[in-house]
A protein has these predicted regions:
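Active-site pocket-lining/capping segments in soluble small-molecule metabolic enzymes
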Residues: 1-155
Length: 155
């Protein structure tokens, strides 16, 4: 999924995929009070963990062309997305001017509020850098630096 907001190597991803597939049944069931099955929402409560959003496996609309010739169809997560047309339009156009978090599913806008992740502030070489890095995220800090430049605080 090009716009999956799941954390890299998320241990709950299969569970979440099944949860989304059965969203209607789950929403109608009496669940454990205050239980949140999403590790990511708990992680993003602490701003120091926000760079993880840039370390996840989604692909920006602007970077999809790097996969040309590797597959014929790109799958987008829109089943429970609040604005599926926004997602489809951005990926069909190959560009998006706005809060990158609005394209992801789940949409993490509320977790990052009052900030937005301005997609136009992500550097052009971002894809090449993160797709070829050694994933030493604890010491590299590239994603943290990009995030600080791309975050815009809204009033």
């Amino acid at each position: 999924l090009a716009n999956s907001g799941c954390l890299r190597y998320c241990p709950s991803q299969t569970f979440h995929d099944n949860l989304v597939a059965h969203d209607e049944e789950v929403a109608g069931a009496d669940n454990v009070k205050d239980w949140n099955p999403h590790l990511c929402w708990s992680l993003y409560r602490d701003r120091k963990n926000w760079p993880a959003i840039l370390q996840a496996s989604w692909v920006r609309p602007e970077d999809l062309h790097h996969y040309d010739g590797l597959f014929k169809v790109v799958k987008l997560a829109t089943r429970v997305h609040e604005h599926p047309r926004l997602v489809l339009h951005a990926y069909a156009q190959g560009k998006y001017r706005g809060n990158l978090l609005d394209l992801l599913e789940p949409g993490f806008g509320p977790a990052f509020a009052p900030c937005v992740l301005d997609n136009t502030r992500i550097p052009a070489g971002f894809f090449r850098r993160v797709s070829s890095c050694n994933a030493e995220c604890g010491s590299c800090r590239y994603c943290a630096r990009v995030l600080e430049k791309a975050l815009v605080r809204c009033a």
